[in-house]
Amino acid sequence: MHHNSQSLSSGHIRSPEDENVAPIGNLKHRTGSLSHISSAHPRVALSDVTNIVATNSSNNSISKPKVAPIKERLDSAAIIEEERLDANSVAQRKEADHNDLLTDREQEEPVEDDGESEEDEEEDQEPLLLQHYASDTLVWEHAFRTYYRTTLDPNDDDVYDVVMVAELSNEIFEYMRKLEDLYKPNPYYMDKQPELRWSFRSTLIDWIVQVHEKFQLLPETLYLCINIIDRYLCKEVVPVNKFQLVGAASLFIAAKYEEINCPTIKDFVYMSENCYSRNDLLDAERTILNGLEFELGWPGPMSFLRRISKADDYEHDTRTLAKYLLESTIMDHRLVSAQPSWLAAGAYFLSKIILGQNQWSLAHVYYSNYTQEQILPLATIILENCRYASKRHNAIWRKYSSRRYLHSSQIVAKWIALAEHRVERSN
């Protein structure tokens, strides 16, 4: 449901002037970098990031780790495998879902700092890419023969919902899968950014998630915003003092594209703590759109998530839990170039495991277009990130701790704690 956005900076009635449009005198065609935008501002909301670069420019050069950390991924894979094979644990999982949830204090215990070497190791982790196996074709063909229909099924409720466009759904999703590959960012773009690191991207996204939640925007707006940022950074070098400006302008663009009533320029200036002016944001908006050649048709994962949930008759709890798991993926730079349909499938698959529904049926293969073998590596990384939620995606964890999202993040945290205990006990 779309939400009406209210200004956070003032309560009076706005003038008829449309502040989402730049003044006529400033409509100058600009492309390329953001260097023409003034940077003479008293402070930056991401000052912790800026100060790191300003005080020690040598940090811009990322050292290569000797050994990549693999223990977390192995432990996460063991948890998934244990839960898939242990049929007797279903009752325990259901009990865990209804027990008292973890408190904020328990979840947000300080994470032990292993020093700069651990941060560098995380910076240098390779992107996760979708793999195709020989058995995938056979499984997909079987699912296609079972569930594909040349005519509409009168027993399918979607046929009677004009919004679902059931007669064109197959062609629509086939086209969307082409778009997700067309607008896929380069996973190595950070190598060409002399002043930025992947950790800076995580800090920016953490702030964007909070602003997005404050404005009560649609999930599609958040995912499109992240895609705009990543694609723009693939094309242009951005200085660290303009990085937050790129994030704010990208969220403004995404809100215009996805929302019925998007926040105003004044709202974004307020949320950036007046670090940037109205004209700065409008100039950045034009620069980014010109850099992307106004190509904003990236499909995003939410439509694919709803499509997959059709295999379970649009079951609400599974999809809500999957939304948390899906949103956690935006923080991981290893998944920058991952297809949104694959991310949706991985989040939904892991959600089913957490809720004790261990079967990835032919219906799930058909509606997701992915087999269980293709999803397992992705689900392992998602689970790994959720095991260290306060470190990896604290703002997202807090967001999904609320009743509005059925306390999804707390349910996942408690399930992980119980699953780890069972794995340790079995060893």
Swiss-Prot record:
Residues 89-105 have a biased composition (Basic and acidic residues). Keywords: Cell cycle, Cell division, Cyclin, Mitosis. GO terms for cellular component: cyclin-dependent protein kinase holoenzyme complex; cytoplasm; lipid droplet; microtubule organizing center; nucleus. Residues 106-126 have a biased composition (Acidic residues). Essential for the control of the cell cycle at the G2/M (mitosis) transition. Interacts with the CDC2 protein kinase to form MPF. G2/M cyclins accumulate steadily during G2 and are abruptly destroyed at mitosis. Belongs to the cyclin family. Cyclin AB subfamily. This is G2/mitotic-specific cyclin-3. It comes from Saccharomyces cerevisiae (strain ATCC 204508 / S288c).
